[in-house]
Amino acid sequence: MSILLEKIKTLPPNPGCYLFKNTKDTIIYVGKAKNLKKRVQSYFTKRNNLKTAMLIEETQDFFYIITNNEQEALILEANLIKTHTPKYNFKLLDDKTYPYIEITKEKHPQLKISRFKQIPPGKIIFGPYPNLKSTKETLKLLHLLYPLRRCQLASKKPCLHFHINQCLGACAGKTINYKPNIDAITKFLKGNIKDILKKLHHLMQKASEKMFYEKAQEYRDIIDSIKQTTKKQLISNQKLKNCDIFAYAFNQDQIAIQILKIRQGNIVDSYRSVFSYVGFVCENILTYLNCYYQKNIKPDIIITGKNQDENILQQTITNQTLLEQILQTKVNIYHKGDKKKLFLLALKNAQNDLSHNNLIYQSKDQKIQEALNKLAIIFNKDIKRIDVFDNSQLFGKAFVAARIVFNHFEFDKKLYRTFHIKGELPNEYQAFEETLTRCYNKGKEAENDATDLILVDGSLVQLRQSQKTLKKLGYEIPLGALQKNNKHQLTHLVTFQEKLMLEQDPNLFHFLKSLSEEVHRFAVSFHRKTKKKLDYKTTLSNIKGVGVVRKKAILNHFESLEAIKKATLQDFQKIGINQKLFLLIKKSL
Protein backbone atom coordinates (compact mmCIF):
# COMPACT_ATOMS: atom_id res chain seq x y z
CA MET A 1 0.00 0.00 0.00
CA SER A 2 2.82 2.42 0.82
CA ILE A 3 4.25 1.93 -2.69
CA LEU A 4 0.88 2.83 -4.20
CA LEU A 5 0.64 5.95 -2.03
CA GLU A 6 4.09 7.02 -3.22
CA LYS A 7 3.04 6.44 -6.83
CA ILE A 8 -0.12 8.52 -6.31
CA LYS A 9 2.02 11.50 -5.30
CA THR A 10 3.48 11.56 -8.81
CA LEU A 11 0.12 11.53 -10.60
CA PRO A 12 -0.61 14.56 -12.82
CA PRO A 13 -3.64 16.82 -12.19
CA ASN A 14 -4.83 16.23 -15.79
CA PRO A 15 -8.10 14.65 -16.88
CA GLY A 16 -7.86 11.04 -17.97
CA CYS A 17 -8.61 7.41 -17.20
CA TYR A 18 -7.04 5.24 -14.49
CA LEU A 19 -6.89 1.44 -14.48
CA PHE A 20 -6.48 -0.64 -11.29
CA LYS A 21 -4.72 -4.03 -11.53
CA ASN A 22 -4.53 -7.01 -9.15
CA THR A 23 -1.61 -9.31 -8.29
CA LYS A 24 -2.22 -11.30 -11.50
CA ASP A 25 -1.73 -8.11 -13.54
CA THR A 26 -5.42 -8.23 -14.53
CA ILE A 27 -7.30 -4.95 -14.95
CA ILE A 28 -10.08 -5.02 -12.33
CA TYR A 29 -11.41 -1.47 -12.53
CA VAL A 30 -11.41 1.42 -15.00
CA GLY A 31 -12.42 4.94 -14.00
CA LYS A 32 -12.26 8.44 -15.39
CA ALA A 33 -11.33 11.68 -13.67
CA LYS A 34 -11.24 15.40 -14.21
CA ASN A 35 -8.15 15.43 -11.98
CA LEU A 36 -6.31 12.09 -11.96
CA LYS A 37 -4.29 12.81 -8.84
CA LYS A 38 -7.24 13.91 -6.68
CA ARG A 39 -9.52 11.14 -7.91
CA VAL A 40 -7.12 8.22 -7.41
CA GLN A 41 -5.93 9.67 -4.10
CA SER A 42 -9.52 9.76 -2.85
CA TYR A 43 -9.74 5.95 -3.03
CA PHE A 44 -6.90 5.58 -0.55
CA THR A 45 -7.57 8.50 1.81
CA LYS A 46 -11.37 8.60 2.23
CA ARG A 47 -13.71 6.17 3.94
CA ASN A 48 -15.12 3.84 1.31
CA ASN A 49 -18.19 1.65 0.96
CA LEU A 50 -17.83 -2.14 1.00
CA LYS A 51 -17.43 -2.55 -2.75
CA THR A 52 -14.79 0.18 -2.97
CA ALA A 53 -12.97 -1.22 0.08
CA MET A 54 -12.86 -4.63 -1.64
CA LEU A 55 -11.49 -3.00 -4.79
CA ILE A 56 -8.71 -1.22 -2.88
CA GLU A 57 -7.86 -4.40 -0.97
CA GLU A 58 -7.40 -6.25 -4.26
CA THR A 59 -5.54 -3.45 -6.06
CA GLN A 60 -1.82 -4.12 -6.44
CA ASP A 61 -0.92 -1.45 -9.01
CA PHE A 62 -2.46 1.09 -11.37
CA PHE A 63 -1.68 3.02 -14.52
CA TYR A 64 -3.38 5.84 -16.34
CA ILE A 65 -3.98 7.54 -19.71
CA ILE A 66 -4.09 11.34 -19.96
CA THR A 67 -6.80 12.95 -22.11
CA ASN A 68 -7.34 16.55 -23.20
CA ASN A 69 -10.61 16.98 -21.29
CA GLU A 70 -13.09 15.17 -19.08
CA GLN A 71 -15.42 14.48 -21.98
CA GLU A 72 -12.72 12.55 -23.82
CA ALA A 73 -11.99 10.68 -20.59
CA LEU A 74 -15.62 9.59 -20.33
CA ILE A 75 -15.66 8.20 -23.87
CA LEU A 76 -12.27 6.53 -23.40
CA GLU A 77 -13.50 4.98 -20.15
CA ALA A 78 -16.36 3.30 -22.04
CA ASN A 79 -13.98 1.97 -24.70
CA LEU A 80 -11.57 0.59 -22.08
CA ILE A 81 -14.34 -1.07 -20.08
CA LYS A 82 -15.71 -2.77 -23.18
CA THR A 83 -12.20 -3.95 -24.07
CA HIS A 84 -11.12 -5.23 -20.63
CA THR A 85 -14.51 -6.01 -18.93
CA PRO A 86 -13.12 -5.32 -15.43
CA LYS A 87 -14.85 -7.17 -12.57
CA TYR A 88 -15.61 -3.99 -10.57
CA ASN A 89 -17.20 -2.14 -13.50
CA PHE A 90 -20.87 -2.80 -14.17
CA LYS A 91 -22.47 0.26 -15.76
CA LEU A 92 -20.81 -0.06 -19.15
CA LEU A 93 -20.70 -3.84 -19.47
CA ASP A 94 -24.09 -3.94 -21.21
CA ASP A 95 -22.65 -2.69 -24.53
CA LYS A 96 -23.87 0.81 -23.80
CA THR A 97 -23.26 3.14 -26.72
CA TYR A 98 -23.09 6.91 -26.88
CA PRO A 99 -25.48 8.95 -29.03
CA TYR A 100 -24.62 10.42 -32.42
CA ILE A 101 -26.48 13.09 -34.39
CA GLU A 102 -27.38 11.66 -37.81
CA ILE A 103 -28.59 13.27 -41.04
CA THR A 104 -30.42 10.49 -42.85
CA LYS A 105 -29.76 9.88 -46.55
CA GLU A 106 -33.31 10.09 -47.86
CA LYS A 107 -35.18 12.19 -50.40
CA HIS A 108 -36.60 14.06 -47.39
CA PRO A 109 -33.81 13.73 -44.78
CA GLN A 110 -34.31 13.73 -41.03
CA LEU A 111 -32.08 15.03 -38.26
CA LYS A 112 -32.13 12.58 -35.37
CA ILE A 113 -30.23 10.96 -32.51
CA SER A 114 -28.87 7.48 -33.35
CA ARG A 115 -26.84 4.83 -31.53
CA PHE A 116 -24.62 2.20 -33.13
CA LYS A 117 -22.76 -0.82 -31.80
CA GLN A 118 -20.85 -0.74 -35.07
CA ILE A 119 -21.31 2.18 -37.43
CA PRO A 120 -22.55 1.14 -40.90
CA PRO A 121 -20.54 2.68 -43.77
CA GLY A 122 -21.81 5.72 -45.62
CA LYS A 123 -23.81 7.37 -42.86
CA ILE A 124 -23.64 11.12 -42.16
CA ILE A 125 -23.05 11.24 -38.43
CA PHE A 126 -21.50 13.54 -35.83
CA GLY A 127 -20.30 12.52 -32.39
CA PRO A 128 -20.31 10.51 -30.24
CA TYR A 129 -21.68 12.75 -27.48
CA PRO A 130 -21.46 11.40 -23.92
CA ASN A 131 -24.06 13.85 -22.58
CA LEU A 132 -27.49 12.86 -23.94
CA LYS A 133 -29.26 15.84 -22.39
CA SER A 134 -26.92 18.32 -24.11
CA THR A 135 -27.31 16.41 -27.37
CA LYS A 136 -31.11 16.66 -27.18
CA GLU A 137 -30.88 20.40 -26.46
CA THR A 138 -28.63 20.89 -29.48
CA LEU A 139 -30.97 18.85 -31.67
CA LYS A 140 -33.86 21.01 -30.46
CA LEU A 141 -31.92 24.14 -31.45
CA LEU A 142 -31.06 22.72 -34.89
CA HIS A 143 -34.69 21.86 -35.52
CA LEU A 144 -35.52 25.48 -34.72
CA LEU A 145 -32.77 27.08 -36.83
CA TYR A 146 -32.29 24.61 -39.70
CA PRO A 147 -35.40 22.40 -39.94
CA LEU A 148 -35.43 19.17 -41.97
CA ARG A 149 -38.23 16.62 -42.11
CA ARG A 150 -39.80 15.87 -38.71
CA CYS A 151 -42.96 14.04 -39.73
CA GLN A 152 -44.11 10.75 -41.23
CA LEU A 153 -44.54 11.06 -45.00
CA ALA A 154 -47.53 8.74 -44.88
CA SER A 155 -49.57 11.64 -43.52
CA LYS A 156 -51.62 13.44 -46.20
CA LYS A 157 -51.78 16.76 -44.34
CA PRO A 158 -49.25 19.25 -42.93
CA CYS A 159 -47.85 18.25 -39.54
CA LEU A 160 -47.77 20.31 -36.34
CA HIS A 161 -44.08 21.15 -36.84
CA PHE A 162 -44.92 22.68 -40.24
CA HIS A 163 -47.34 25.09 -38.56
CA ILE A 164 -44.64 26.29 -36.11
CA ASN A 165 -41.94 26.63 -38.82
CA GLN A 166 -39.93 23.56 -37.72
CA CYS A 167 -40.72 21.45 -40.81
CA LEU A 168 -40.14 22.54 -44.40
CA GLY A 169 -43.32 20.93 -45.71
CA ALA A 170 -42.57 17.49 -47.10
CA CYS A 171 -45.83 16.42 -45.51
CA ALA A 172 -47.62 19.17 -47.46
CA GLY A 173 -46.25 17.90 -50.77
CA LYS A 174 -43.80 20.77 -51.26
CA THR A 175 -40.63 20.51 -53.34
CA ILE A 176 -37.78 21.32 -50.97
CA ASN A 177 -34.07 22.05 -51.38
CA TYR A 178 -32.54 20.68 -48.16
CA LYS A 179 -28.91 21.38 -49.13
CA PRO A 180 -28.57 24.86 -47.50
CA ASN A 181 -29.84 23.57 -44.15
CA ILE A 182 -27.77 20.38 -44.34
CA ASP A 183 -24.66 22.46 -45.10
CA ALA A 184 -25.45 24.78 -42.18
CA ILE A 185 -26.01 21.84 -39.79
CA THR A 186 -22.78 20.18 -40.96
CA LYS A 187 -20.84 23.41 -40.52
CA PHE A 188 -22.31 23.90 -37.06
CA LEU A 189 -21.64 20.34 -35.81
CA LYS A 190 -18.07 20.48 -37.13
CA GLY A 191 -17.48 23.29 -34.68
CA ASN A 192 -18.21 26.49 -36.60
CA ILE A 193 -20.54 27.95 -33.97
CA LYS A 194 -19.36 31.54 -33.81
CA ASP A 195 -22.36 33.10 -35.61
CA ILE A 196 -24.97 31.12 -33.67
CA LEU A 197 -23.37 31.82 -30.31
CA LYS A 198 -23.17 35.51 -31.13
CA LYS A 199 -26.88 35.56 -31.97
CA LEU A 200 -27.84 33.60 -28.85
CA HIS A 201 -25.76 35.86 -26.59
CA HIS A 202 -27.56 38.83 -28.13
CA LEU A 203 -30.97 37.24 -27.50
CA MET A 204 -29.98 36.32 -23.93
CA GLN A 205 -28.87 39.88 -23.18
CA LYS A 206 -32.07 41.34 -24.65
CA ALA A 207 -34.21 38.97 -22.56
CA SER A 208 -32.24 39.86 -19.44
CA GLU A 209 -32.62 43.61 -20.10
CA LYS A 210 -36.39 43.12 -20.40
CA MET A 211 -36.26 41.11 -17.13
CA PHE A 212 -37.37 37.92 -18.90
CA TYR A 213 -34.98 36.00 -16.67
CA GLU A 214 -36.42 32.56 -17.36
CA LYS A 215 -36.03 33.13 -21.09
CA ALA A 216 -32.49 34.42 -20.55
CA GLN A 217 -31.68 31.28 -18.55
CA GLU A 218 -33.11 29.18 -21.36
CA TYR A 219 -30.73 30.85 -23.84
CA ARG A 220 -27.88 30.33 -21.37
CA ASP A 221 -28.66 26.60 -21.19
CA ILE A 222 -28.75 26.36 -25.00
CA ILE A 223 -25.35 28.09 -25.24
CA ASP A 224 -23.87 25.64 -22.70
CA SER A 225 -25.35 22.68 -24.58
CA ILE A 226 -23.86 23.89 -27.85
CA LYS A 227 -20.41 24.28 -26.31
CA GLN A 228 -20.63 20.85 -24.72
CA THR A 229 -21.87 19.09 -27.86
CA THR A 230 -19.49 20.69 -30.34
CA LYS A 231 -16.33 20.24 -28.25
CA LYS A 232 -13.70 18.62 -30.44
CA GLN A 233 -13.26 14.91 -29.70
CA LEU A 234 -10.04 12.99 -30.30
CA ILE A 235 -10.96 9.79 -28.49
CA SER A 236 -13.43 8.81 -31.25
CA ASN A 237 -12.62 9.53 -34.89
CA GLN A 238 -14.55 7.44 -37.41
CA LYS A 239 -12.11 8.31 -40.22
CA LEU A 240 -9.45 6.23 -38.45
CA LYS A 241 -10.57 2.60 -38.46
CA ASN A 242 -7.58 0.47 -37.51
CA CYS A 243 -4.36 2.24 -36.61
CA ASP A 244 -1.82 2.74 -33.83
CA ILE A 245 -0.74 6.22 -32.77
CA PHE A 246 2.92 6.02 -31.77
CA ALA A 247 4.92 8.57 -29.79
CA TYR A 248 7.96 8.56 -27.57
CA ALA A 249 9.87 10.82 -25.22
CA PHE A 250 13.42 10.40 -24.01
CA ASN A 251 16.18 11.79 -21.86
CA GLN A 252 19.81 10.81 -21.52
CA ASP A 253 18.96 7.62 -19.63
CA GLN A 254 15.51 6.40 -20.65
CA ILE A 255 12.95 6.19 -23.45
CA ALA A 256 9.19 6.26 -22.86
CA ILE A 257 7.01 4.59 -25.50
CA GLN A 258 3.27 5.31 -25.86
CA ILE A 259 1.01 3.50 -28.35
CA LEU A 260 -2.68 4.44 -28.57
CA LYS A 261 -4.66 1.66 -30.25
CA ILE A 262 -7.55 2.82 -32.44
CA ARG A 263 -10.05 0.21 -33.57
CA GLN A 264 -13.24 1.08 -35.48
CA GLY A 265 -12.54 4.76 -34.87
CA ASN A 266 -12.24 4.49 -31.07
CA ILE A 267 -9.22 4.49 -28.76
CA VAL A 268 -9.77 1.14 -27.09
CA ASP A 269 -6.45 0.67 -25.31
CA SER A 270 -2.97 2.03 -24.79
CA TYR A 271 0.46 0.45 -24.42
CA ARG A 272 3.24 2.16 -22.53
CA SER A 273 6.79 1.28 -21.60
CA VAL A 274 9.73 3.10 -20.05
CA PHE A 275 13.15 1.50 -20.47
CA SER A 276 16.84 2.32 -20.22
CA TYR A 277 18.79 2.37 -23.44
CA VAL A 278 22.31 2.21 -24.83
CA GLY A 279 23.38 3.93 -28.05
CA PHE A 280 21.18 6.01 -30.34
CA VAL A 281 17.56 6.75 -29.51
CA CYS A 282 16.21 6.12 -33.01
CA GLU A 283 17.90 2.74 -33.34
CA ASN A 284 16.54 1.64 -29.98
CA ILE A 285 13.03 2.65 -31.04
CA LEU A 286 13.27 0.74 -34.33
CA THR A 287 14.41 -2.37 -32.46
CA TYR A 288 11.73 -1.94 -29.85
CA LEU A 289 8.90 -1.57 -32.40
CA ASN A 290 10.13 -4.56 -34.34
CA CYS A 291 10.02 -6.73 -31.19
CA TYR A 292 6.69 -5.28 -30.09
CA TYR A 293 4.88 -5.99 -33.36
CA GLN A 294 6.28 -9.51 -33.53
CA LYS A 295 4.17 -10.23 -30.46
CA ASN A 296 1.19 -7.99 -31.23
CA ILE A 297 -1.27 -7.63 -34.09
CA LYS A 298 -0.12 -5.01 -36.56
CA PRO A 299 -2.63 -2.29 -37.49
CA ASP A 300 -3.33 -1.12 -41.04
CA ILE A 301 -1.26 1.99 -40.40
CA ILE A 302 1.07 3.38 -37.72
CA ILE A 303 0.74 7.12 -37.23
CA THR A 304 3.45 9.24 -35.67
CA GLY A 305 4.47 12.89 -35.81
CA LYS A 306 7.13 15.51 -35.26
CA ASN A 307 9.37 14.69 -32.30
CA GLN A 308 10.90 16.98 -29.72
CA ASP A 309 14.28 16.75 -31.48
CA GLU A 310 14.73 17.78 -35.15
CA ASN A 311 17.66 15.38 -35.60
CA ILE A 312 15.57 12.51 -34.29
CA LEU A 313 12.78 13.51 -36.69
CA GLN A 314 15.14 13.35 -39.66
CA GLN A 315 16.35 9.93 -38.54
CA THR A 316 12.72 8.80 -38.19
CA ILE A 317 11.90 9.95 -41.73
CA THR A 318 15.05 8.23 -43.05
CA ASN A 319 14.08 5.01 -41.28
CA GLN A 320 10.40 5.24 -42.24
CA THR A 321 10.80 3.00 -45.30
CA LEU A 322 12.94 0.57 -43.33
CA LEU A 323 10.31 0.39 -40.60
CA GLU A 324 7.56 -0.23 -43.17
CA GLN A 325 9.60 -3.05 -44.67
CA ILE A 326 10.27 -4.62 -41.28
CA LEU A 327 6.70 -4.36 -40.02
CA GLN A 328 4.95 -4.90 -43.36
CA THR A 329 2.56 -2.07 -42.57
CA LYS A 330 2.26 1.60 -43.54
CA VAL A 331 3.96 4.25 -41.36
CA ASN A 332 2.92 7.90 -41.75
CA ILE A 333 4.33 11.05 -40.16
CA TYR A 334 1.68 13.77 -39.79
CA HIS A 335 2.20 17.49 -39.19
CA LYS A 336 -1.40 18.76 -39.09
CA GLY A 337 -5.05 17.85 -38.54
CA ASP A 338 -6.65 15.30 -36.22
CA LYS A 339 -3.85 12.79 -36.76
CA LYS A 340 -1.34 15.31 -35.44
CA LYS A 341 -3.60 16.02 -32.45
CA LEU A 342 -3.80 12.31 -31.66
CA PHE A 343 -0.03 12.08 -31.94
CA LEU A 344 0.31 15.03 -29.55
CA LEU A 345 -2.01 13.24 -27.11
CA ALA A 346 0.20 10.13 -27.26
CA LEU A 347 3.28 12.33 -26.90
CA LYS A 348 1.80 14.04 -23.83
CA ASN A 349 1.32 10.62 -22.20
CA ALA A 350 4.86 9.51 -23.15
CA GLN A 351 6.40 12.70 -21.72
CA ASN A 352 4.37 12.31 -18.55
CA ASP A 353 5.44 8.66 -18.17
CA LEU A 354 9.08 9.62 -18.61
CA SER A 355 9.06 12.41 -16.02
CA HIS A 356 7.04 10.50 -13.43
CA ASN A 357 8.94 7.28 -13.97
CA ASN A 358 12.07 9.13 -12.90
CA LEU A 359 10.34 10.37 -9.75
CA ILE A 360 8.92 6.94 -8.87
CA TYR A 361 12.12 5.01 -9.41
CA GLN A 362 14.35 7.62 -7.83
CA SER A 363 12.14 7.42 -4.76
CA LYS A 364 12.06 3.60 -4.89
CA ASP A 365 15.83 3.30 -5.35
CA GLN A 366 16.39 5.77 -2.53
CA LYS A 367 14.28 3.67 -0.14
CA ILE A 368 16.01 0.47 -1.22
CA GLN A 369 19.38 2.14 -0.65
CA GLU A 370 18.29 3.21 2.84
CA ALA A 371 17.28 -0.40 3.61
CA LEU A 372 20.60 -1.70 2.24
CA ASN A 373 22.46 0.86 4.36
CA LYS A 374 20.62 -0.41 7.44
CA LEU A 375 21.53 -4.01 6.57
CA ALA A 376 25.15 -2.92 6.05
CA ILE A 377 25.19 -1.58 9.62
CA ILE A 378 23.54 -4.74 11.01
CA PHE A 379 25.92 -7.15 9.25
CA ASN A 380 28.96 -4.85 9.13
CA LYS A 381 29.36 -5.23 5.38
CA ASP A 382 28.33 -3.38 2.21
CA ILE A 383 25.30 -5.16 0.79
CA LYS A 384 24.61 -5.30 -2.95
CA ARG A 385 23.60 -8.91 -3.57
CA ILE A 386 21.23 -10.86 -1.31
CA ASP A 387 20.39 -14.57 -1.74
CA VAL A 388 17.04 -15.55 -0.19
CA PHE A 389 15.84 -19.13 0.46
CA ASP A 390 12.49 -20.75 1.18
CA ASN A 391 10.92 -24.19 0.89
CA SER A 392 7.47 -25.55 0.21
CA GLN A 393 5.80 -28.91 0.89
CA LEU A 394 2.49 -30.56 1.74
CA PHE A 395 2.67 -33.16 4.51
CA GLY A 396 6.17 -34.07 3.40
CA LYS A 397 5.14 -34.60 -0.22
CA ALA A 398 6.67 -32.78 -3.17
CA PHE A 399 9.22 -31.15 -0.85
CA VAL A 400 10.98 -28.41 -2.81
CA ALA A 401 13.18 -25.40 -2.10
CA ALA A 402 13.95 -22.21 -3.98
CA ARG A 403 16.50 -19.43 -4.10
CA ILE A 404 15.99 -15.94 -5.45
CA VAL A 405 18.66 -13.26 -5.86
CA PHE A 406 18.31 -9.52 -5.34
CA ASN A 407 21.22 -7.78 -7.00
CA HIS A 408 21.92 -4.08 -7.65
CA PHE A 409 18.38 -2.78 -6.97
CA GLU A 410 16.50 -5.54 -8.83
CA PHE A 411 15.62 -9.22 -8.79
CA ASP A 412 18.13 -11.14 -10.90
CA LYS A 413 15.98 -13.94 -12.33
CA LYS A 414 18.90 -15.49 -14.22
CA LEU A 415 20.22 -16.62 -10.83
CA TYR A 416 16.92 -18.02 -9.51
CA ARG A 417 17.19 -21.74 -8.65
CA THR A 418 14.81 -24.54 -7.63
CA PHE A 419 15.58 -27.84 -5.87
CA HIS A 420 13.75 -31.14 -5.41
CA ILE A 421 14.54 -32.27 -1.86
CA LYS A 422 15.59 -35.91 -1.72
CA GLY A 423 14.60 -38.47 0.91
CA GLU A 424 11.26 -39.77 2.15
CA LEU A 425 10.34 -37.41 5.01
CA PRO A 426 12.94 -34.63 5.33
CA ASN A 427 12.42 -31.90 7.93
CA GLU A 428 13.02 -28.20 7.27
CA TYR A 429 16.55 -28.23 8.71
CA GLN A 430 17.57 -31.17 6.52
CA ALA A 431 15.93 -29.48 3.54
CA PHE A 432 17.91 -26.27 4.05
CA GLU A 433 21.14 -28.20 4.57
CA GLU A 434 20.63 -30.04 1.28
CA THR A 435 19.62 -26.84 -0.53
CA LEU A 436 22.63 -24.83 0.66
CA THR A 437 24.98 -27.72 -0.12
CA ARG A 438 23.69 -28.09 -3.66
CA CYS A 439 23.61 -24.34 -4.21
CA TYR A 440 27.09 -23.48 -2.89
CA ASN A 441 29.07 -26.67 -3.52
CA LYS A 442 32.27 -26.90 -5.54
CA GLY A 443 31.91 -25.75 -9.10
CA LYS A 444 29.43 -23.02 -8.19
CA GLU A 445 32.00 -20.51 -6.92
CA ALA A 446 31.76 -18.21 -9.94
CA GLU A 447 27.98 -17.99 -9.57
CA ASN A 448 28.10 -17.26 -5.83
CA ASP A 449 31.27 -15.22 -5.29
CA ALA A 450 29.36 -11.93 -5.26
CA THR A 451 26.87 -12.94 -2.52
CA ASP A 452 26.97 -10.38 0.32
CA LEU A 453 24.15 -11.72 2.49
CA ILE A 454 22.08 -14.91 2.77
CA LEU A 455 18.57 -14.80 4.22
CA VAL A 456 16.75 -18.00 5.20
CA ASP A 457 13.21 -18.63 6.36
CA GLY A 458 13.04 -19.47 10.06
CA SER A 459 14.47 -18.71 13.48
CA LEU A 460 17.82 -18.68 15.30
CA VAL A 461 17.93 -22.50 15.24
CA GLN A 462 17.67 -22.47 11.45
CA LEU A 463 20.33 -19.76 11.33
CA ARG A 464 22.81 -21.90 13.30
CA GLN A 465 22.15 -24.97 11.16
CA SER A 466 22.69 -22.95 7.99
CA GLN A 467 25.93 -21.48 9.34
CA LYS A 468 27.32 -24.98 10.01
CA THR A 469 26.48 -26.07 6.47
CA LEU A 470 28.15 -23.01 4.91
CA LYS A 471 31.30 -23.46 7.02
CA LYS A 472 31.60 -27.04 5.76
CA LEU A 473 31.46 -25.66 2.23
CA GLY A 474 34.14 -23.07 3.01
CA TYR A 475 31.92 -19.97 2.92
CA GLU A 476 31.96 -17.06 5.39
CA ILE A 477 28.87 -15.18 4.24
CA PRO A 478 26.75 -13.13 6.66
CA LEU A 479 23.47 -14.86 7.55
CA GLY A 480 20.06 -13.64 8.65
CA ALA A 481 16.68 -15.29 9.19
CA LEU A 482 13.28 -13.93 8.23
CA GLN A 483 10.95 -14.94 11.04
CA LYS A 484 7.17 -15.01 10.61
CA ASN A 485 4.22 -15.34 12.97
CA ASN A 486 1.57 -18.09 12.91
CA LYS A 487 -0.27 -16.16 10.18
CA HIS A 488 2.81 -16.39 7.97
CA GLN A 489 3.41 -12.63 8.29
CA LEU A 490 6.97 -11.31 8.47
CA THR A 491 7.72 -9.90 11.93
CA HIS A 492 11.47 -10.11 12.75
CA LEU A 493 14.93 -10.16 11.24
CA VAL A 494 17.00 -12.61 13.29
CA THR A 495 20.81 -12.38 13.46
CA PHE A 496 23.31 -14.08 15.74
CA GLN A 497 23.49 -10.90 17.83
CA GLU A 498 19.88 -9.68 17.98
CA LYS A 499 16.25 -10.11 17.01
CA LEU A 500 14.99 -6.96 15.27
CA MET A 501 11.28 -6.13 15.37
CA LEU A 502 10.70 -4.91 11.83
CA GLU A 503 7.60 -2.81 12.54
CA GLN A 504 9.95 -0.31 14.21
CA ASP A 505 11.69 0.25 10.86
CA PRO A 506 8.99 0.50 8.12
CA ASN A 507 11.49 1.04 5.32
CA LEU A 508 13.51 -2.07 6.15
CA PHE A 509 10.30 -4.02 6.77
CA HIS A 510 8.87 -3.25 3.31
CA PHE A 511 12.15 -4.13 1.62
CA LEU A 512 12.54 -7.48 3.42
CA LYS A 513 8.84 -8.20 2.93
CA SER A 514 9.27 -7.80 -0.84
CA LEU A 515 12.14 -10.33 -0.74
CA SER A 516 10.11 -12.73 1.40
CA GLU A 517 7.05 -12.51 -0.85
CA GLU A 518 9.09 -13.05 -4.00
CA VAL A 519 10.90 -16.15 -2.73
CA HIS A 520 7.61 -17.53 -1.35
CA ARG A 521 5.90 -16.97 -4.72
CA PHE A 522 8.73 -18.66 -6.58
CA ALA A 523 8.86 -21.66 -4.20
CA VAL A 524 5.09 -22.18 -4.14
CA SER A 525 4.87 -21.94 -7.93
CA PHE A 526 7.53 -24.64 -8.30
CA HIS A 527 5.84 -26.77 -5.63
CA ARG A 528 2.53 -26.68 -7.50
CA LYS A 529 4.19 -27.84 -10.71
CA THR A 530 6.00 -30.61 -8.82
CA LYS A 531 2.86 -31.73 -6.99
CA LYS A 532 0.90 -31.79 -10.24
CA LYS A 533 3.55 -33.95 -11.89
CA LEU A 534 3.69 -36.24 -8.84
CA ASP A 535 -0.09 -36.69 -8.93
CA TYR A 536 0.20 -37.45 -12.64
CA LYS A 537 2.78 -40.18 -12.03
CA THR A 538 0.79 -41.62 -9.10
CA THR A 539 -2.39 -41.82 -11.18
CA LEU A 540 -0.59 -43.69 -13.97
CA SER A 541 1.04 -46.09 -11.48
CA ASN A 542 -2.39 -47.11 -10.17
CA ILE A 543 -3.65 -48.15 -13.62
CA LYS A 544 -3.46 -51.91 -14.18
CA GLY A 545 -1.45 -52.74 -17.25
CA VAL A 546 0.69 -49.59 -17.16
CA GLY A 547 4.14 -50.72 -16.14
CA VAL A 548 7.41 -48.81 -15.83
CA VAL A 549 8.15 -48.76 -19.57
CA ARG A 550 4.66 -47.69 -20.63
CA LYS A 551 4.44 -45.12 -17.85
CA LYS A 552 7.70 -43.58 -19.00
CA ALA A 553 6.46 -43.47 -22.60
CA ILE A 554 3.19 -41.79 -21.54
CA LEU A 555 5.01 -39.26 -19.32
CA ASN A 556 7.38 -38.35 -22.15
CA HIS A 557 4.58 -37.98 -24.70
CA PHE A 558 1.85 -36.21 -22.67
CA GLU A 559 2.53 -33.20 -20.48
CA SER A 560 -0.39 -33.62 -18.05
CA LEU A 561 -3.49 -35.58 -17.09
CA GLU A 562 -5.53 -33.02 -19.02
CA ALA A 563 -3.55 -33.84 -22.17
CA ILE A 564 -4.25 -37.57 -21.67
CA LYS A 565 -7.97 -36.91 -21.19
CA LYS A 566 -8.09 -35.03 -24.51
CA ALA A 567 -5.94 -37.55 -26.39
CA THR A 568 -7.38 -39.87 -29.06
CA LEU A 569 -6.70 -43.54 -29.73
CA GLN A 570 -4.43 -42.48 -32.60
CA ASP A 571 -2.34 -40.41 -30.15
CA PHE A 572 -1.84 -43.46 -27.89
CA GLN A 573 -1.12 -45.81 -30.79
CA LYS A 574 1.88 -43.60 -31.66
CA ILE A 575 3.54 -44.77 -28.40
CA GLY A 576 2.48 -48.41 -28.69
CA ILE A 577 -0.71 -48.37 -26.59
CA ASN A 578 -3.47 -50.60 -28.01
CA GLN A 579 -7.22 -49.91 -27.93
CA LYS A 580 -7.89 -52.14 -24.90
CA LEU A 581 -5.33 -50.37 -22.70
CA PHE A 582 -6.38 -46.99 -24.14
CA LEU A 583 -9.97 -47.58 -22.97
CA LEU A 584 -8.73 -48.76 -19.56
CA ILE A 585 -6.60 -45.62 -19.11
CA LYS A 586 -9.50 -43.37 -20.13
CA LYS A 587 -11.84 -45.16 -17.73
CA SER A 588 -9.34 -44.82 -14.85
CA LEU A 589 -9.12 -41.05 -15.34
UniProtKB/Swiss-Prot annotation:
Stretches assigned to the GIY-YIG domain: 13-90
Superkingdom of origin organism: Bacteria
Subcellular location: Cytoplasm
A GO MF label: DNA binding
GO biological process, one term: SOS response
Primary residence: cytoplasm
SMART domains, per the entry: GIYc (SM00465)
Gene3D superfamilies: 5' to 3' exonuclease, C-terminal subdomain, GIY-YIG endonuclease, UvrC, RNAse H endonuclease domain
Start and end residues of each UVR domain: 194-229
One GO cellular component, as annotated: cytoplasm
Keyword annotations: Cytoplasm, DNA damage, DNA excision, DNA repair, Excision nuclease, SOS response
Record-linked SUPFAM superfamilies: C-terminal UvrC-binding domain of UvrB (SSF46600), GIY-YIG endonuclease (SSF82771), RuvA domain 2-like (SSF47781)
Family: Belongs to the UvrC family.
Functional summary from the UniProt entry: The UvrABC repair system catalyzes the recognition and processing of DNA lesions. UvrC both incises the 5' and 3' sides of the lesion. The N-terminal half is responsible for the 3' incision and the C-terminal half is responsible for the 5' incision.
NCBIfam families: uvrC
Subunit structure, as described in the record: Interacts with UvrB in an incision complex.
Name of protein: UvrABC system protein C
